[in-house]
Amino acid sequence: MPAGGEGPLEGVVQTTSSALREATSSRDYILLTIGFFVCGLQLVFITTHLPTYLVDSGISGDTASWSLALIGLFNIVGAFLCGWLGGIVSKKKTLAIVYLLRGLIIVAFVSLPPSPVIALLFGAAMGLLWLGTIPLTSGLIVTFFGPRHLSMLYGLVFLSHQLGSFVGAWLGGIWYDWYGNYEAMWWLNAGAGLFAFGVNWAIREPEPLAPAPA
């Protein structure tokens, strides 16, 4: 259960409505939900608008496609690695660092001169951080509230992710239509990553229980 929360009494089956009230009154669950909004914002902005950004920067469409492909390829490794790390070190710190690294990689990407090599390196680096947020986020929910209502509680957090996804795709398109570039949107995504780092670092993750003596 979250630090400072009451949690269900041991041996008592918690109702869905009770679990929902507990979660929505939990500071840490709310922070986790806010952070996951940023995840959706970044991921869908990149998948929707990266190809156009690269082509506008003089990079070929083939290279733009390979950059997206590398995101998918390296995501396989990154998601596994983040899930593994979440099992041996602090989940909230690992999650916060994922968001921090995303922000820093975006800063480096838009600060360096565009080139095919930079585009491919960006795809690989972002892929390592792409969906690693999912096992860490769901793991924190289980840590806070147990597994019984995970599908509902994770579903609500994922709704925030999807709202962020909408904002990332829509706002990127609106900005491009108005100004003909993505510069401010990249910096918005970088700043959002730093914001999500702070939000997730502020989560109070319970210490793991020591094993009972034999």
Show which residues each predicted segment covers:
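Multi-pass alpha-helical transporter architecture, strongest
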Residues: A190-A214
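Paired intracellular helix-loop junctions of major facilitator superfamily
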Residues: I141-L150, G180
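Loop-to-transmembrane helix entry/capping segments in MFS-fold secondary transporters
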Residues: G61-D62, P147-L156
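Interfacial helix-cap and linker-helix signal at transmembrane-aqueous boundaries
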Residues: L54-V55, L85-G86, L171-G180
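C-terminal transmembrane helical hairpin of 12-TM major facilitator-type secondary transporters
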Residues: A69-N75, A79-L81, I88-L140
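Juxtamembrane intracellular "pre-TM" segments in multi-pass secondary transporters
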Residues: P2-L31
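A membrane-interface helix-boundary motif in multi-pass transporters
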Residues: I174-A192
